[in-house]
């Protein structure tokens, strides 16, 4: 958390997952056998992910209820790193939100269902804020906050292209920010005061290599 009282952590329970073996041919003087947990397609044994909140003042740990989909995955959202922090050896890891609330994503294994969720300290479970549903694989990008957390900028492929959408903190869509037959790649900076977003995009010019990025 920004005030360092709490920290959230995801834990993957792989005990039921079967092992996979590979040969490390670069080992010296002879190749070695490497073993790790890996779920093959069609296998029922899958990692189970848990979310914990730790209180460093009260010295307590709490597991937060996150279950929704079979073989789901969860991922915490983090505050964007400042430019001066990019070259630091020990980079800060601060959750996206305020001292008592943070955001995370919850995804089904086939990535057809993605929930942007929030958690407020004191609750027992997370709360879905934005729900994405598609019959194809979806990608995601980091969430961004505006107006002291009262607004959210979400990257979504819902119309077949990657674009930005503005929501309030209750999950109500206010408006779409970008539109067109091109792809928003990454948000670089958000000017909260001027309400301006600096981002990179691909495919802006149909006669140009689509891998060329524009700012």
Regions found by a protein language model. Give the residues of each.
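Glycine-enriched catalytic-core subsegment of oxygenase/oxidase enzymes
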Residues: 162-163, 173
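Beta-propeller blade signature
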Residues: 49-57, 117-124, 166-170, 213-215
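Short coil/turn segments at the loop-to-beta-strand junctions that recur within blades
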Residues: 68-71, 132-138, 180-185
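Beta-rich catalytic cores
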Residues: 47, 89-91, 112, 139-141, ...
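Structural signature of eukaryotic scaffold interfaces centered on beta-propeller domains
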Residues: 1-3, 84-98, 142-148, 189-192
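A short beta-strand motif characteristic of beta-propeller blades
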Residues: 62, 79-83, 127-133, 173-178
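Predominantly five- to eight-bladed beta-propeller fold
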Residues: 1-79, 213
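Beta-strand C-termini and the immediately following turn/loop, strongest in propeller blades
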Residues: 8-14, 42-45, 93-98, 103-110, ...
């Amino acid at each position: 958390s920004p005030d360092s009282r709490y920290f959230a952590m995801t834990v993957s329970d792989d005990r039921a997952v079967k092992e996979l073996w590979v040969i490390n041919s670069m080992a010296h003087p002879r190749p070695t056998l490497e073993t790790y947990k890996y779920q093959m397609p069609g296998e029922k044994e899958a990692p189970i992910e848990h979310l914990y909140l730790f209180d460093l003042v009260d010295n307590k740990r709490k597991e937060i209820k996150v279950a929704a989909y079979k073989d789901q995955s969860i991922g915490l959202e983090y505050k964007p790193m400042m430019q001066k922090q990019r070259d630091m050896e020990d980079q800060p890891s601060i959750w996206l939100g305020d001292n008592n609330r943070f955001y995370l994503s919850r995804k089904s294994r086939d990535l057809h269902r993605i929930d942007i969720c929030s958690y407020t300290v004191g609750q027992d479970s997370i709360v879905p804020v934005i729900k994405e549903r598609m019959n194809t694989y979806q990608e995601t990008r980091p969430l961004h906050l505006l107006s002291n957390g009262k607004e959210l900028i979400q990257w979504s492929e819902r119309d077949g292209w990657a674009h930005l959408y503005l929501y309030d903190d209750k999950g109500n869509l206010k408006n779409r920010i970008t539109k067109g037959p091109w792809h928003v790649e990454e948000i670089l900076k958000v000017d909260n005061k001027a309400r301006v977003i600096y981002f990179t995009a691909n495919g802006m010019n149909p006669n140009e290599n689509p891998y060329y990025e524009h700012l």
